[in-house]
Structures are given as C-alpha cells and as structure tokens.
C-alpha cells in the first residue's frame, strides 16, 4: 500500500502539501500574574506575528483552586495566569480574534473546566465552538506518573479525558483533544 500525505492513515501527514502551503503554528508559552497582564502579552505576541497562543496557567488553576482559596496563598500567578471564573477567561482573551487563531492550553486535571470557560467566552462574543481551533493538553496520566497535580482518582480522571473527546467530536470538531507530553514522564525516570 502506498501511503500519501493528506490521506488515511495519515502517516505521511494530515495535509497533502504539508508545510509547503501552510507553515506550522508559531506560538510562545505565556501566562503572567493576571488575566489582564497575560492579555497584554498575547496582544504583543500577535503583533509580532505568532499564529497561535499558548496559555500557561498558575498552579492553583492547574489543581482546581480559586485564587482566593486558602490553599492558593503564595501561588497565585507565580507560574502562569490565574483563571477562576468566566470573567477571568473573558479578560484573558479580550479583543483577541479566537476564531482566527489557534489556542493551546497546557492544562490537565482541570482541562474540562478550562475548555468550557474558553468555549463560553467565545460564544459570548458570538463565536461558535465549531469554528474554534486549538489544543488542550488533557494528559492526565502524566499527572499521576510525573507531576502529581491530579485531583480525582484515575478512573474519574480518565472519564473526564474521554468526555472531552466525545464533546469536542460534536461541538468543537477543529479542537485537538489531547496532547501527550512525554517529557515529564521521561524526566520522572521512564526508560522508554
């Protein structure tokens, strides 16, 4: 069997001409101390020519704590942007044409919540979830094996992962529903 780019089983790529016609998405991982600061950075990056955004979330957001929770003290905005509410998500993407760019969210345990906030924020602007393009990491096994930022038991967590697959297949078909990150597992001692 001769495999061709742009044709099933896509082992030679998903597009017939691959990057000859369309360059890969250029993006920089970013998330600052607040949604407003991060929004300013995103606007700057877009002005510099990036074709996508990559959101870094703070630790409380990664493990499901609101910024005002006592367990969040000292961690809010330290390693990324704090997102606790739809208002925060609205501020993060204020005046950004999310229907024209690709957004990557490096988030796992709270992936379903953050994706829902992103979609709701877009829909409030009149943008259909079916037009949104992006990726959510949604790699919960990495959290158990390497990072430790999981919330729920494994079965419940895996159910959330697959619920995202199911939801996006109908409501956000251009969305990449998982991005496996082997780096963390390798750094935690994997030999494969």
Task: Specify the residue positions occupied by each region the protein language model found.
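Catalytic alpha/beta active-site cores
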Residues: 1-192
């Amino acid at each position: 069997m001769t495999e061709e780019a742009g044709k099933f089983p896509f082992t030679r790529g998903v597009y017939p001409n691959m990057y000859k016609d369309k360059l890969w998405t250029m993006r920089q991982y970013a998330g600052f101390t607040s949604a407003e600061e991060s929004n300013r950075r995103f606007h700057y990056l877009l002005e510099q020519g990036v074709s996508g955004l990559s959101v870094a979330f703070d630790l409380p957001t990664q493990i499901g704590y609101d910024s005002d929770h006592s367990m969040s003290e000292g961690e809010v905005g330290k390693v990324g942007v704090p997102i606790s509410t739809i208002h925060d998500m609205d501020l993060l993407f204020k005046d950004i044409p999310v229907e024209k760019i690709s957004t990557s969210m490096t988030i796992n345990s709270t992936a379903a919540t953050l994706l829902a906030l992103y979609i709701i924020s877009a829909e409030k602007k009149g943008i259909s979830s079916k037009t949104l393009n992006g990726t959510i990491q949604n790699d919960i096994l990495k959290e158990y094996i390497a990072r430790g930022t999981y919330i729920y038991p494994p079965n419940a967590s895996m159910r959330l992962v697959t619920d995202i697959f199911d939801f996006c297949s109908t409501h956000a078909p251009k969305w990449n529903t998982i991005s496996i990150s082997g780096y963390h597992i390798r750094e935690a001692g994997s030999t494969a």
